Design a protein with these regions (language model features):
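Conserved alpha/beta enzyme-core scaffold
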Residues: 1-276
């Protein structure tokens, strides 16, 4: 059952060195505040999992938190490369990082399989792709019923999943509004989970606009809930604040240079305090 903690205490308790960590949120609700807390606590040797790593993983990688990244499409959306990811993979700074790249479809299926407690996900995919030649976690199997050749990938079962959402209620249930990625599946697939939210309300069912088909992550599936106002900036939170498009453009120059990046992290993450 969900426990209400500060973000500092939630990360300290559930994100251990060497853990496999998934931070999800597609386009919006990207858990930047939680990612920054992981950096502040100098967590190390993490295996990071995410569909579209985005700036948050560029920052974690450049800060030395990651040893491995499992992902689908790594880039700065609408801008270009993730330069800290590239520097780690190509030149080993701040240290070498192993990568396993999948398709979006495979990653989504892998999270869904993990949430169901299955060992693998099966899909139609990778036809004509060269990814299987560089990722030994992509296999092909024959359907026992039709004989069709299908792709198979391991399910995603993180040690801890971290997501951001708009609201949680006092019972620990979480409401995700707007574009829904694999946040729910990531939480259900994980051994432990942290959910950061913009606010806590008494009862989600009493909130204006609540409807039975809303995406709810149940409190029994969540380990810790932490309030992190504007916790997904510079991405956006539907109904709360817009995306900071200017920062995504600025990040390209910040991340290109090691010294500029290090100075930015020191000023904006290490010395910023965060959502305590």
């Amino acid at each position: 059952m969900a426990e209400f903690l500060s973000l500092h205490d939630a990360v300290e308790r559930y994100v251990e060195d060497g853990a496999t960590v998934a931070m999800e949120g597609f386009t919006h609700l990207i858990p930047f505040a939680a990612g920054h807390e992981v950096i502040r606590q100098k967590k190390r040797d993490l295996t990071l999992i995410r569909m579209t790593p985005d700036l948050v993983y560029d920052q974690l990688i450049g800060a030395g938190c990651a040893k491995k990244v499992i992902f689908s499409w790594g880039g700065n959306p609408g801008v270009g490369s993730l330069h800290r990811l590239r520097d780690a993979v190509e030149k080993g700074w701040p240290h070498q990082v192993e990568i396993l790249e999948h398709s979006h479809a495979a990653m989504a299926c892998a999270f869904e399989a993990g949430a169901a407690g299955l060992p693998l996900a099966v899909l139609r995919g990778y036809v004509g792709s060269e990814l299987p030649s560089v990722n030994d976690q992509i296999k092909f199997i024959e359907c026992p019923f039709t004989g069709e050749r299908l792709a198979a990938v391991p399910s995603v079962r993180p040690d801890v999943s971290i997501v951001h959402a708009q609201k949680a209620d006092r019972a620990g249930n979480v409401l995700v509004e707007g574009i829904v990625g694999v946040q729910k599946e990531a939480v259900l697939a994980a051994r432990q989970s942290i959910v950061t939210v913009e606010e806590i309300v008494e009862d989600l069912r009493s909130e204006p606009g609540y409807h039975p088909n809303a995406c709810i992550i149940p409190g029994w599936a969540i380990s810790a809930i932490a309030v992190a106002e504007k916790g997904s900036l510079p991405s956006y939170a539907h109904g709360y604040y817009p995306r900071n498009n200017a920062f995504y453009k600025e990040w390209d120059a910040i991340a290109r240079d090691r010294d500029t990046f290090t100075a930015w992290i020191e000023e904006n993450v290490m010395n910023a305090g965060g959502n305590a």
